């Protein structure tokens, strides 16, 4: 039976068109001198550079690409999910990452011909348009394209049947079958779900640690590590902070849980086992809807929780293989930020 949580987008739809716009290569143009008034910006290709961004609830990645498709710089800044931090703050973080990349490559901002930004929290058309307008104002003269984080992740996975699992601050899965039909599930935000995400793992760890303290009168090993490494004097202080800024507090607990799990902490391992099960369920839902279960498909993992914990990676791979035994598990062919840049050029 099809689950209502998944949404179908057929091959003729917007998502397919956006996710496949990454293969065209622009021709190179000659160098010209730019009088920027800064010793750092000496030469730039005439309006040929492209910026690509991958922005989520924790950080933003930016790549600067030349006309031949070569990555000249890769820099990072803070969160740029506009649904969580607001359009103004998201734009500021994108500008920060862009300026770092431009400075590193000694390129002036007015040499940027186009930019593509794959951003979490832009699933609604009105939010996409708000971000597009904001970035168009920040980068006058550049063609601005806004994609969701899932769109650029699917593009970064390459062609053919594939399911992309995004496991970062939030969680979601998107898949494409051999007919080009695309399905997605998850990505509803932490207050509505996003099981297995860094936010979910962090909130589960905090809830468990506080419950154990109430029952035993002392902090568990994991609980002590959470308080110590986050710099809180008490659980009351952590609760106050989490009530005000949950998006800051709970995802920051994930690295602590990950390290504890690799150190064989039983509580941390139990939390991550549950998270792996939640994430594999997302992939299985997409496979059922896209009729991918009988195909030789690739499952691609990406996001901030991937590659951070040996135990979690092993358990997640095992859960995925149980759900889809015939699937292969691998990584993206390029970074989502690079996919966004290539899509913006086409």
Identify the meaning behind each predicted range:
Residues 33-35, 42-43, 147:
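Short, positively charged and aromatic/hydrophobic N-terminal segments
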Residues 41-110, 134, 139, 156-162, ...:
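ATP-binding/phosphotransfer module of carbohydrate and carboxylate kinases, centering on a glycine-rich
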Residues 112-118, 147:
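Glycine- and acidic-rich phosphate- and metal-coordinating loops
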Residues 16, 20-25, 38-46:
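Short, intrinsically disordered or compositionally biased N-terminal tails of bacterial proteins
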Residues 122-220:
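Phosphate-binding/catalytic loop of phosphoryl-transfer enzymes
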Residues 3-8, 12, 19-24, 29-33:
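Low-acidity, Ser/Thr- and Arg-rich intrinsically disordered low-complexity segments
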Residues 116-123, 167-169, 297-308:
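Glycine-rich beta-strand-to-loop/alpha-helix junction loops that act as flexible
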Residues 56-58, 113, 167-169:
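Short, basic and Ser/Thr-rich N-terminal targeting/leader segments
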